[in-house]
Amino acid sequence: MAKMKNPPHPGLMLKVMYLEPLGLNITETAEKLDMPRSALSEIVNAKRAISPEVAVKLEKAFPKHSASFWLRAQAGYALSRVNPHCADKVKPIKTSPLMESV
């Protein structure tokens, strides 16, 4: 699977795929998702990650996209922002042959 260089924050995806086309605002969507308005606003504005709980709520509200979809999008976004040099000093740790087959 090819890695996207700069994947969008899943909150932006939520905004573009659902909120804007359906004419939903943050307040009414937060109520429908049973979550604080401030939390949804932070997600949509890329200031907060989509948690597993929120992903399940999004799946229920918008069944076209599964909770796994939202979590994969969040993981892809987070990984794209990792400093590639953060592990420069990390050395491989020898594991048992049994672990290599897993």
Curated annotation (Swiss-Prot):
This is Virulence-associated protein A. The keyword DNA-binding applies. Residues 25-44 bind DNA. SUPFAM superfamilies: lambda repressor-like DNA-binding domains. InterPro entries: Cro/C1-type_HTH, Lambda_DNA-bd_dom_sf, Toxin_antidote_HigA. One of its GO terms (molecular function) is DNA binding. It comes from Dichelobacter nodosus (Bacteroides nodosus). Signal peptide: none annotated. Residues 14-69 form the HTH cro/C1-type domain. The keyword Nucleus does not apply. Keywords: DNA-binding, Virulence. Belongs to the VapA/VapI family. CDD domains: HTH_XRE.
